[in-house]
A protein has these predicted regions:
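A glycine-rich beta-to-alpha transition motif near the start of alpha/beta enzyme domains, typified by
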Residues: 1-175
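Positively charged, low-complexity/disordered segments
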Residues: 179-187
Length: 187
């Protein structure tokens, strides 16, 4: 009789930023072996997204067979002075076992501030009751500072509105929380 390892549940958030979608993780929620760069982290993230997939569909993961949706983001509280959050971006290849950690995704950068606030990575004292919260992001891949301006209503990220973006059907920021591998979804 074969024995199998138990399924691993890891908190993740599937978000849209601009015209891209990706799976977001708080670094602390990843398995310990995946909290540092290396094959354990990459193999785990490849599995979450569903790569490599010789059919190019990523049916067995959260990717969607498109470079616009085959992306991962890892965020953590920043220890870089004058920054709230560290942002690490990975572009996941669809048909091969590779993650490119060398660049940034401007589209998903638009979702980093919202995720950081909603997941307690921004000091609560810096979040206004209403208005705009400036989230100071250290983009680890390229070593640059990015400042996100996130609308806040009643101390929560404002995820609805009427802004329209070419190539995106709906105005609001889409966010779904998942426990990966895909075992539970909640909105």
């Amino acid at each position: 009789m074969s024995t199998f390892a138990p399924q691993l549940a890891v908190k993740a958030t599937y978000m849209r930023g601009g015209t891209s979608k990706g799976t977001f993780f708080n670094l602390e929620d990843l398995p310990t072996s995946c909290q540092v760069a290396g094959s354990s982290r990459d193999n785990f993230l490849l599995r979450v997204v569903g790569s490599p997939d010789p059919y190019g569909k990523q049916i067995d993961g959260l990717g969607n067979g498109s470079s616009s949706t085959s992306k991962v983001v890892i965020l953590s509280k920043s220890e870089v002075p004058n920054h709230d959050v560290n942002y690490l971006f990975g572009q996941v290849a669809i048909d091969k076992a590779m993650i490119d950690w060398s660049g940034n995704c401007g589209n998903l950068t638009a979702a980093v501030g919202s995720f950081a606030i909603a997941n307690g990575l921004v000091d609560a004292a810096n979040i206004p009751d209403n208005g705009i919260c400036k989230v100071r992001i250290w983009q680890q891949n390229i070593g640059k500072t990015i400042v996100a301006h996130v609308p806040i209503t009643n101390r929560q990220v404002q995820e609805t509105g009427d802004f329209e973006l070419d190539g995106v059907t709906f105005a609001e920021i889409g966010r779904a929380h998942v426990w990966t591998p895909v075992t539970q979804w909640y909105l």
